[in-house]
Amino acid sequence: MAAANLLSRALLPALNPNPSSHSNRVSPSAVSLRCRHGLTASVRASLSTAAPSPPPRPAAAAADGRAPKRCFRRGADGHLYCEGVRVEDAMGAAERTPFYLYSKPQVVRNFTAYRDALEGLRSIVGYAVKANNNLRVLQLLRELGCGAVLVSGNELRLALRAGFDPTRCIFNGNGKTLEDLVLAAESGVFVNIDSEFDLENIVTAARVAGKKVPVLLRINPDVDPQVHPYVATGNKTSKFGIRNEKLQWFLDSIKSYSNDITLVGVHCHLGSTITKVDIFRDAAGLMVNYVDEIRAQGFELEYLNIGGGLGIDYHHTDAVLPTPMDLINTVRELVLSRDLTLIIEPGRSLIANTCCFVNRVTGVKSNGTKNFIVVDGSMAELIRPSLYGAYQHIELVSPSPDAEVATFDIVGPVCESADFLGKDRELPTPDKGAGLVVHDAGAYCMSMASTYNLKLRPPEYWVEDDGSIAKIRRGESFDDYMKFFDNLSA
């Protein structure tokens, strides 16, 4: 069988114990990066002694103001680049694989696309911290003018540590604890009311903190976002928000607690990976009708929060997907007609395409019916494919031009049949030690990582504006894990 033959040839390099025999492997001494104490040095774009092909130019903002789709691009030399830096070189410089590699300029470009789209509107861009909670990423977004959307007390603490303006932060969630709500009240962030007991807890927290809390009502508009059921949040079966049949009860209750809370707006969130902006328009139309109804009862509403959820091109098919400008233009007139401040909560569309998950191939095998590429990354570091059946584009960092192409499942070392990063992917057969990346890994990947099988969370790096690489999170170590057991009684 042809596939079996090419797999046999692919496994031959495994017999050579000398890793330097792989022509694409970069000597760690040849590349430098930010060290543990924060010093930064540039990474050379190419370490070849031959005259290299020029790397692709770093992605720039499109003429119409839309952010470019991808910052990771294949060069004429066959290597994968991030903003002009070879990913192969980043692998040689990293403390270990797997790791996450970001483009800092792409984060800026993505935010700029939202900022430009919101021109002419009063607005708050509230970054969904749950998508990616790296402190350096948060600090960058705060510097750009982002607020923060939070769903736990620790996310609130992290946002405050990152320097976010509390008056541009929103505390969401269907199970907020009293302790976390007291912190929210003391901090001065907006708080969304999600249920009857949530309202009671918010009032109690306001009294404990001695602060009047600005609140929004999270109304479930029962709009089908046409996405995976696990990421749909605005339909009638969702655990989030209040049903419109109960709206009057909440309004009456809020009036009775006027010394403790102030109703300042309404909120909805439809789901995630949404690729049709008319869904946002339909929801916004329902929400402004609620605004009219609530204002008619004497409430002075200022804010309309339409949530987030804009999808991205995970399949890398160059499909025409809605942009931030498309999204905002569908609701612009509705917002202006009611003189509202618009709050949006992007997460995935701000951060997903800025990052890839970089792995090293452990080996290639076949069980007679399936071909497998086994890598050192796994569902522990990136669970979306296992959890949602999600597709993320996968490619080799520096494939050999002579490698035969076959269909593979890309799997990790975790002791679960569900441990896969991709299935049925046509790829050149890689050598042992080759680099393999999972694209669009900036959102809901590292933030959902676990220590299952005692796989420790990986390091993170980003490419700076000047082409240098900086470590933005160190990898967890076994010693870090053991510290949880220090000084415990026998």
Curated annotation (Swiss-Prot):
The modification N6-(pyridoxal phosphate)lysine is found at residue 130. InterPro entries: Ala_racemase/Decarboxylase_C, DAP_deCOOHase_LysA, De-COase2_C, De-COase2_CS, De-COase2_N, De-COase2_pyr-phos_BS, Orn/DAP/Arg_de-COase, PLP-binding_barrel. GO terms for biological process: lysine biosynthetic process via diaminopimelate. GO terms for molecular function: diaminopimelate decarboxylase activity. The active site is at residue 415. One of its GO terms (cellular component) is chloroplast. Pyridoxal 5'-phosphate binds at residues 309, 345-348, 444. Substrate binds at residues 348, 384, 388, 416, 444. The keyword Isomerase does not apply. It catalyses: meso-2,6-diaminopimelate + H(+) = L-lysine + CO2. Residues 45-66 are annotated as: Disordered. Its cofactor is pyridoxal 5'-phosphate. It is found in: Plastid, Chloroplast. Pfam families: Orn_Arg_deC_N, Orn_DAP_Arg_deC. Keywords: Amino-acid biosynthesis, Chloroplast, Decarboxylase, Lyase, Lysine biosynthesis, Plastid, Pyridoxal phosphate, Transit peptide. Its EC number is 4.1.1.20. The keyword Nuclease does not apply. Belongs to the Orn/Lys/Arg decarboxylase class-II family. LysA subfamily. Specifically catalyzes the decarboxylation of meso-diaminopimelate (meso-DAP) to L-lysine. HAMAP family: LysA (MF_02120). This is Probable diaminopimelate decarboxylase, chloroplastic. It comes from Oryza sativa subsp. japonica. The lineage of its organism: Eukaryota, Viridiplantae, Streptophyta, Embryophyta, Tracheophyta.
